[in-house]
Amino acid sequence: MNIALIAHDRKKELMVQFCMAYCGILAKHNLCATGTTGKLVAEATGLRIEKYLPGMQGGEQQISARVSYNEIDLVLFFRDPMSSSEYEPDVHLLARLCDMHNIPIATNVATAEMLILGLDRGDLDWRNIVNPKAR
């Protein structure tokens, strides 16, 4: 499966900790991330991550483009609900695209944990039919 990782600045450390905790599961999949998030997670975990531009330079839009082509199977987007509204258009676009293509998205660690454990159980195997290239 293709998994996208995105985290607002104040949530990057939480994303790193989450990926360290679930490194064994994440290592079985193809990972991509916005630039800074990907760099931090890769350095902390040793996971192989395709890195896009930093979020504020278009990385979220690059991931959104892959979502629009149904090339991403799961999005983990740890967003900061207290951040300024400058991020909101990107967040809404990505969420809308995930809804359009039935791509699971977690915007907090509680939901991310449920999705990652479901992924490990095989609950998301139906995505292999939708996106056979992600195997």
Short names for language-model regions:
Residues 30, 47-58, 126-129:
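Short hydrophobic/aromatic-enriched beta-strand-loop microsegments
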Residues 48-51, 68, 93-94, 121-126:
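Short, hinge-like loop/turn segments at secondary-structure boundaries
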Residues 28-37:
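Short internal beta-strands
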Residues 110-135:
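Short, glycine-/small-residue-rich phosphate/pyrophosphate-handling segment
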Residues 60-100:
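Mid-chain, well-packed structural core segment of small domains
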Residues 95-115:
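Short, acidic/small-residue loops that bind anionic groups at enzyme active sites
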Residues 1-27:
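N-terminal phosphate-binding or glycine-rich loops at protein starts, especially the Walker A/P-loop
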